A protein has these predicted regions:
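Structural preference for alpha-helix termini/caps and helix-kink/transition segments
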Residues: 5-7, 11-193
Length: 193
């Protein structure tokens, strides 16, 4: 832990139940799968924070692709065949999960590009199926599809609420400025920061 040996006497250890209280189990799995291959795991907060970010990106990208409701066989796309080969090569190398995870992230990155550019829906659907099979099925890094979609809807409604609140505050601020109520306009400006 943080470059030191984990021990009770140093007070720098976590039990599994403590770790699961503090960290989402899938994020913890992501962190451990991403640990350097054949080396001791230096478990620290930076490792967890990085895993929260990268796992979140993976799940978000997967969810956005899943929401497209397409269906396609990923084997139709040569780039996914190549990713599969590299993934399996890493796993065949004494379960080098870090190499496998790099392939999962590369597929997610390419899928993100397709989503952002309005790419082929069949290709996006193929990438979704690939990620489901390899990141979800093999590595166990994805929540259930229904949970992913539920969380996306919750996030969208939260974004809408924030957007409506900001618009309301901007309108109030403009009204305060028009009526030369500078104190109220400044107060609203500070709230918007």
């Amino acid at each position: 832990v943080d470059g030191e040996k984990m021990s009770k006497s140093l007070g720098n250890f976590w039990t599994i139940s403590e770790a699961l209280k503090n960290v989402d189990p899938l994020v913890l799995r992501y962190a451990l799968i991403n640990a350097p291959y054949r080396q001791p795991v230096d478990f620290n907060q930076v490792m967890i924070d990085d895993s929260v970010v990268h796992h979140g990106r993976l799940v978000t990208c997967y969810g956005e692709g899943l929401a497209k409701n397409g269906s396609s066989d990923w084997r139709e796309f040569s780039w996914l065949e190549k990713a599969t080969s590299r993934f399996e090569s890493g796993m065949d190398d004494d379960f080098n999960t870090r190499v496998a995870l790099v392939e999962v992230q590369s597929v997610a990155k390419r899928m993100r590009g397709l989503l952002d550019s309005g790419g082929e829906s069949e290709e996006i659907a193929g990438a979704v199926c690939w990620i489901s099979e390899y990141a979800g099925g093999v590595l166990g890094l994805l929540p259930e599809d229904a949970e992913v979609l539920r969380n996306m809807k919750r996030q969208e409604s939260a974004k809408d609420e924030i957007s409506q609140r900001v618009e309301s505050l901007l309108l109030q601020r403009n009204n305060a400025r028009e009526s030369k109520d500078w104190a109220r306009a400044d107060e609203i400006r500070d709230e918007l920061k």
